[in-house]
């Protein structure tokens, strides 16, 4: 999901 860019980019 696109909730946090730090967890959504590296962890998608």
Curated annotation (Swiss-Prot):
Q: In which tissues is it expressed?
A: Expressed by the venom duct.
**Compartmental location:** Secreted
Chief location bin? secreted
Q: What keywords were assigned to this record?
A: Acetylcholine receptor inhibiting toxin, Amidation, Ion channel impairing toxin, Neurotoxin, Postsynaptic neurotoxin, Proton-gated sodium channel impairing toxin, Secreted, Toxin
Indicate yes or no for the key word Secreted: yes
Q: Does the entry feature the keyword Secreted, yes or no?
A: yes
What cellular component terms from Gene Ontology apply here? Answer: extracellular region; host cell postsynaptic membrane
> What does the UniProt record tell us about how this protein is modified after translation?
Both amidated and non-amidated conorfamides As2 are found in the venom. Amidation is important since amidated peptide is more active.
Molecular function (GO) terms for this protein are: acetylcholine receptor inhibitor activity; ion channel regulator activity; toxin activity
Q: Which residues are recorded as modified (Phenylalanine amide)?
A: 12
UniProt feature coiled coil, ranges: none
The entry's function note states:
Conorfamide As2a: this amidated form is active on both ASIC channels and nicotinic acetylcholine receptors (nAChRs). Potentiates ASIC1a (EC(50)=10.9 uM). Inhibits desensitization of ASIC1a and to a lesser degree ASIC3 currents, resulting in a sustained opening of channels in the presence of low pH. Inhibits with a slow reversibility human alpha-7/CHRNA7 nAChRs (IC(50)=689-3867 nM) and with a rapid reversibility human alpha-1-beta-1-delta-epsilon (CHRNA1-CHRNB1-CHRND-CHRNE) nAChRs (IC(50)=208 nM). Conorfamide As2b: this non-amidated form is only weakly active on both ASIC channels and nicotinic acetylcholine receptors (nAChRs). Shows a very weak inhibition of peak current of rat ASIC1a and ASIC3. No inhibition or very weak desensitization of both rat ASIC1a and ASIC3 are observed. Reversibly inhibits both human alpha-7/CHRNA7 nAChRs (IC(50)=2971-7036 nM) and human alpha-1-beta-1-delta-epsilon (CHRNA1-CHRNB1-CHRND-CHRNE) nAChRs (IC(50)=707 nM).
Protein's name according to its UniProt entry: Conorfamide-As2
